[in-house]
Amino acid sequence: MEDVVLSIRDLHKIYPGGVHAVRGVDFDVHEGESVAIIGSSGSGKSTVLRCINRLIEPTDGVIELRGEQINTPSANVNQVRSRIGMVFQSFELFSHLKVLDNVTLGLRHVRGMSKSEAEEVALDVLERVDMLERIDAYPGNLSGGQKQRVAIARALAMKPEVILFDEPTSALDPELIGSVLQTIRGLADEGMTMVIVTHEINFARDVADRIVYLDQGKVAEEGPSSIINQPKTERLQRFLSSMHEDKIPEGIENELVSTQTDHGYIPDGTGNRPRS
């Protein structure tokens, strides 16, 4: 289809020692779509993302970005990474650089922007993640949630065609998770194309347009976000039962409801939200 941004076909990854982490994964991501990948630890979720962004090389399979295969020897890895943003579990900020400089660095060195051009873009994206007041702070003076929001701003600044989120809240203290989830929800409402690996099941249900459930390196079930409430396979049923449903700590869900009502979206468990 014309609106397919990212296409994954028969993706395999075998690590040294014969560990077959990803076994024939297939899925598409459409323009403006949010796809959540869920599954137990070791199911291959993060490996899939790292293959997409060429941080590791798949053993077999095809990865296409807007119809162009990007996992070939001739593909320019740096160009691929500039088109596909990635936000990691850890924040990967430069500790010796202020917030503003962390965001402008890639714009100046990869995009070739002047300092003033880069700062204009950086200020815009930092405002989008509610970090405009901390532009002169160093990472060491920020909370974990603030660091992650700066990392999201840095990815947004490069104007990627799709952003990959690899467990963006797993390294955060429970009380800091809400602000990061709120930021990602805002991007979804803006129509940003995203693939999100997460253990936050309620968040996936309420924000994602589609869910991809991985089990032992394979797609065991895929469908609209409603499969969280109505799983079709026994494997997904077992997985959801093991997650004890609510992974968002007490108090944070209420915070997210109050902050999102201004956007016309209340996380009600239906998976319904406005689309741009």
PLM feature spans:
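ABC family nucleotide-binding domain
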Residues: V4-L6, H12-A208, V212-E222
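C-terminal boundary and immediately downstream tail of ABC-type ATPase nucleotide-binding domains
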Residues: Q216, S226-D268
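Long, low-complexity, intrinsically disordered segments
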Residues: I266-S276
